[in-house]
Amino acid sequence: PGSVPDYDREYLAEIDGARDFYMDTPLYSQLCYSNEKVQEKMIDSVVEYLLDHPEVDYLHFWLGDNYNNFCECEKCAQLSVSDWYVVLLNKLDERLTQKHISAKIVFLIYFELLWPPVQKQLKHPERFVMMFAPITRTYSKSFLGEKRVEGVKRALPKFRLNRLRFPSDLRENLEFLYANQDRFSGDAFDFDYHLMWEPFKDLAGVKLAEVIHDDVRALKDLGLNGMVSCQIQKAFMPHGLGIYAMGRTLENSDVDFDRLRKEYLSAAFGDHVSSVVNILQIFYDCHCPEYLRNEHSEIDARQAEAFDNGADRLREGAKQLRFLRKEESDKTVDLSLKLLAYYCELCAHYFLALGAKARGEAREKVREKFSEMHKFLFENESEYGNYLDSFYFDLMSEQILNSDWNNVLTA
């Protein structure tokens, strides 16, 4: 309270009887979308921007970020969240038409907006492009092979304002897509998060790259015409296979993943591919990405032992890579070996902390081992920070190590 001027407070969503920034963060704050002054201010801003930027062909028109943060006032309760969104979209379309602005408007289905509108419909769907953003999906599997069965519909979970949980299951996510496609048959694309948090869960990155490849191949069957990647920019450690697979498969969805893998690893590691593949396999021998995704039991003696063993093996792998560098004259290959050697050392520290967690050791012990990893990470950031997002590696590892294995987003 007090962070918002009183004369602006009426514009914010009312939650539990109060209107304020959600979690003290403007980005996470929804507005009172039934308020006509809010509607006009939002639409005026978009129109003004497009008049100033006639070069824009597609403009994204999103609501606030986060979830379970929509307005509970009496007027907003008259329509669903998605219906109020359609009201805004139709008003925006009308104003753009009046101004002879031809730009397409991208609307999103994300968190609460996954539930399709009930009472309202887009008046001119040709103005719009739909963006499917399955932020809570699992990346342990791909969409490949999933296809809508004509005539078969699964009921969506009941919408409960500000009391929602969101699915990790792929088919459940796709049911939301299909329900929205029943209401909107225009252009649509996938807005996905493969390279946002997942590089810090699938630490070797090879299986993740294959999921990316398969997801891109699946787009056509899902009625989606492309992909926008919401990701970190420094996604190149232990390698850049994930983003390479994404780009090449978007260019040609028929390309074989094994071919891409061999192309990339050969270009990056030259004659040392066999050794590198063996070292990357250590990660999968000693940790499963599903563990870091909270999809396995937190306390697991076998996984703890594997983490401890993996730490030793990764340190040996780092020694081997440094030895290979001694006679390597190719600068690209030398850099790739250097980055992988550092990454093995870093993950050896991480594995020791994860082993302590999997054994159920006291949080202080886990924290102590995390601190050693944290120190190693940031002591080397100036040298390796262009290739690895140190902030996100630190943040994600700390969250995983400190969590009680309860994902509040998903059912």
Residue ranges and their predicted role:
Residues 211, 299-309, 331-334, 338:
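Non-transmembrane, amphipathic alpha-helical segments
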Residues 338-353:
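Amphipathic alpha-helical repeat scaffolds of TPR domains
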Residues 1-262, 308, 315, 320, ...:
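Catalytic-core regions of glycoside hydrolase
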Residues 272, 322-338:
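Flexible helix-coil transition and linker loops at the boundaries of alpha-helical arrays
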Residues 243, 248-252, 263-309:
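Long, charge-rich alpha-helical interaction segments
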Residues 286-298, 321-328, 353-360:
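Secondary-structure edge/capping motif, primarily at the C-terminal ends of alpha-helices
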